[in-house]
Amino acid sequence: MAVPNELKYSKEHEWVKVEGNVATIGITEYAQSELGDIVFVELPETDDEINEGDTFGSVESVKTVSELYAPISGKVVEVNEELEDSPEFVNESPYEKAWMVKVEISDESQIEALLTAEKYSEMIGE
């Protein structure tokens, strides 16, 4: 199971890629494999504020609906509109095509509190 080293991870199975003051957020390969085939993705709007620990959307699979929890706080600056028409990207390419939102980071310390790839791998038993 892929756990890219350059990303940070939340205990709720979101990944975070930091570029300057913008964080790209998605769900991990482990999360999508547990959910099964993704059929619908609900995401916030551009300019919405999201807060660490709060839900910012959901992912619906053939098995269940799972909430998405914000690993950091900030303002949504971009949403991956392609997931509306192609939710299967979450299964096919969780770290590339299936990024969900880009957020302007409001508190850098929240990034430091996230898990490293090594710690996340330990958590999921990889």
Curated annotation (Swiss-Prot):
Keywords (A to Z) from UniProt: Lipoyl
Record-linked Gene3D superfamilies: 2.40.50.100
Keyword rRNA-binding attributed: no
Residue span, Lipoyl-binding domain: 22-104
Keyword match Amino-acid biosynthesis: no
GO-annotated cellular components: cytosol; glycine cleavage complex
A family per Pfam: GCV_H
PROSITE patterns: BIOTINYL_LIPOYL (PS50968), LIPOYL (PS00189)
GO biological process: one example: glycine decarboxylation via glycine cleavage system
Residues annotated with N6-lipoyllysine modification: K63
Cofactor note: Binds 1 lipoyl cofactor covalently.
Cofactor(s) of this protein: (R)-lipoate
Membership in a protein family: Belongs to the GcvH family.
Subunit (UniProt): The glycine cleavage system is composed of four proteins: P, T, L and H.
Function of the molecule: The glycine cleavage system catalyzes the degradation of glycine. The H protein shuttles the methylamine group of glycine from the P protein to the T protein. Is also involved in protein lipoylation via its role as an octanoyl/lipoyl carrier protein intermediate.
Protein name: Glycine cleavage system H protein
The encoding gene: gcvH
